[in-house]
């Protein structure tokens, strides 16, 4: 698990959701009838939250006010297992709060409560001391600058210098027009408008994009210069040449927090030794997930994998499957297995399982799970291909891949009407049976097994 230190401006995102179908008699403004409220972690905390969703360990450095919002904010961070030992309280400021009013899933106004003054010398010293203490034990750093007073020029440059001294990857999400503040960072993630304002250069051509990225590299000594281009993806330099990593087409509901998702996923993928191109593809996939949701949303590894693999529409992560089935009234049948080298016996078994109900869900062991259960030489067929083959069967309605050795979490979440296992489970404990209304044992078709097929192939090769 990678350990990442995030430093920056902490923002509490508050949402009022409802319907607006009339104007106020007091003024020509819409009236919102509130149906629900929600609170999200924003700013640098949203970056940290994205990293948690991507299975990283996160230390968060920032400042909240001495108020109720700050107290709630810290509790929300702890609930997400984000280290809060360097969240400082500033008695001279309020916790930054952005309130968004949403009517019929459209944002109609945002109200900001904030103080942008720079931190006092004592708070800056405490942040730098914590950074200095942590820099040796973490893998990478993200500076998330929302221009709310935490990351001034001097503190930013000291942190970049310390990260470079200890050979740590450091990425910055910049604000403002003076990019010398981020000089010598490993990578910065400006969007098109931010970079145009900083360099006073219109990015309306490949030539100007390339020129802008060269300036970041040569003038500001950014090791991996790139620019995010909204629906056009991400552009970066590779051996001096401009490369565009296109975005993944997806319906956009809300771009709130997409930049936080991009820098979090870029950081983690680079720390996992991906190339810059691979990291940009990963970040684009993560962004495609979050813009398809309302609010400062998160992308899970399973959702990103689904986008990257462009898999069959029947192959869903558990969260998405539960959403799909939320209002169903049909009888659900669940079974699971490795299904390595799909054969007639598998197909016959699944057809009989489907006949027991309306919706057949197949839990599929991941490659890592199969390897633990059956040895290093298995699976023969990758989980991506196994899932696709299963989804291609007309009797299978959904396929969900699980990483664990058993499907207990899937069964507990899905609570199927019927749990189907092979007849070889007779007089054996059936994991998850307590969460199903009924358990059925089903005979396999004789003469068919993956192991037998593998042995037959071996004998043929030896002959």
Curated annotation (Swiss-Prot):
Record-level Gene Ontology MF annotations: ATP binding; heptose 7-phosphate kinase activity; heptose-1-phosphate adenylyltransferase activity; phosphotransferase activity, alcohol group as acceptor
Annotated keywords: ATP-binding, Carbohydrate metabolism, Kinase, Multifunctional enzyme, Nucleotide-binding, Nucleotidyltransferase, Transferase
Catalytic activity: D-glycero-beta-D-manno-heptose 7-phosphate + ATP = D-glycero-beta-D-manno-heptose 1,7-bisphosphate + ADP + H(+); D-glycero-beta-D-manno-heptose 1-phosphate + ATP + H(+) = ADP-D-glycero-beta-D-manno-heptose + diphosphate
Binding site residues for ATP: 191-194
Domain of life, source organism: Bacteria
GO BP terms in the entry: ADP-L-glycero-beta-D-manno-heptose biosynthetic process
Pfam family, one: CTP_transf_like
Annotated active site: 260
Region (Ribokinase): 1-311
InterPro entries: Bifunc_HldE (IPR023030), Cyt_trans-like (IPR004821), PfkB_dom (IPR011611), RfaE_dom_I (IPR011913), RfaE_dom_II (IPR011914), Ribokinase-like (IPR029056), Rossmann-like_a/b/a_fold (IPR014729)
EC number: 2.7.1.167, 2.7.7.70
Its job: Catalyzes the ADP transfer from ATP to D-glycero-beta-D-manno-heptose 1-phosphate, yielding ADP-D-glycero-beta-D-manno-heptose.
Subunit structure: Homodimer.
Family: In the N-terminal section; belongs to the carbohydrate kinase PfkB family. In the C-terminal section; belongs to the cytidylyltransferase family.
Name by which UniProt lists this protein: Bifunctional protein HldE
Species name: Helicobacter pylori (strain Shi470)
């Amino acid at each position: 698990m990678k350990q990442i230190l995030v430093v920056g401006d902490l923002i509490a995102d508050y949402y009022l959701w409802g319907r607006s179908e009339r104007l106020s008699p007091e003024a020509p403004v819409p009236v919102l009838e509130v149906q629900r409220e929600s609170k999200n972690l924003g700013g640098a905390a949203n970056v940290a939250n994205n990293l948690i969703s991507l299975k990283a360990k996160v230390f968060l450095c920032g400042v909240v006010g001495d108020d109720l919002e700050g107290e709630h904010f810290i509790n929300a961070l702890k609930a997400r297992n984000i280290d809060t030992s360097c969240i400082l309280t500033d008695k001279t400021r309020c916790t930054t709060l952005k309130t968004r009013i949403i009517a019929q899933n459209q944002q109609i106004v945002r109200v900001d409560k904030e103080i942008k003054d720079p931190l006092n010398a004592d708070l800056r010293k405490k942040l730098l001391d914590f950074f200095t203490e942590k820099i040796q034990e973490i893998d990478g750093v993200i500076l998330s600058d929302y221009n709310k007073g935490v990351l001034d020029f001097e503190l930013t440059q000291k942190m970049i210098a310390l990260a470079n001294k200890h050979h740590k990857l450091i990425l910055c999400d910049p604000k403002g027009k003076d990019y010398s503040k981020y000089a010598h960072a490993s990578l910065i993630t400006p969007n098109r408008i931010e970079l145009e304002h900083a360099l006073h250069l219109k990015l309306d051509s490949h030539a100007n994009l390339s020129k802008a990225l060269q300036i970041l590299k040569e003038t500001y000594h950014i090791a991996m210069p790139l620019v995010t281009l909204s629906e056009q993806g991400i552009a970066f330099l590779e051996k001096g040449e401009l490369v565009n990593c296109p975005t993944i087409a997806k319906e956009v509901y809300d771009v709130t927090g997409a930049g936080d998702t991009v820098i979090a996923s870029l950081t983690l993928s680079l720390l996992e030794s991906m190339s810059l191109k691979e990291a940009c593809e990963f970040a684009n996939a993560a962004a495609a997930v979050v813009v398809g949701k309302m609010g400062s949303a998160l992308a899970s590894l399973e959702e990103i994998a689904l986008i990257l693999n462009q898999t069959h529409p029947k192959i869903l992560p558990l969260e998405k499957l539960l959403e799909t089935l939320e209002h169903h009234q049909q009888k659900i049948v669940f079974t699971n297995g490795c299904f390595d080298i799909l054969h007639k016996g598998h197909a016959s078994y699944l057809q009989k399982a489907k006949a027991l109900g309306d919706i057949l869900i197949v839990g599929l062991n991941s490659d890592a799970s199969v390897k633990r259960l059956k040895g290093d030489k298995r699976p023969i067929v990758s989980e991506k291909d196994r899932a696709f083959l299963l989804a291609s069967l007309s009797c299978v309605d959904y396929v969900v891949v699980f990483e664990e050795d058993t499907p207990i979490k899937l069964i507990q979440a899905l609570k199927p009407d019927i749990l189907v296992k092979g007849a070889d489970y007779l007089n054996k404990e059936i994991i998850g049976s307590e969460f199903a209304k009924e358990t059925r044992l089903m005979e396999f078709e004789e003469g068919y097994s993956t192991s037998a097929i593998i042995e037959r192939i071996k004998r043929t090769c030896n002959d």
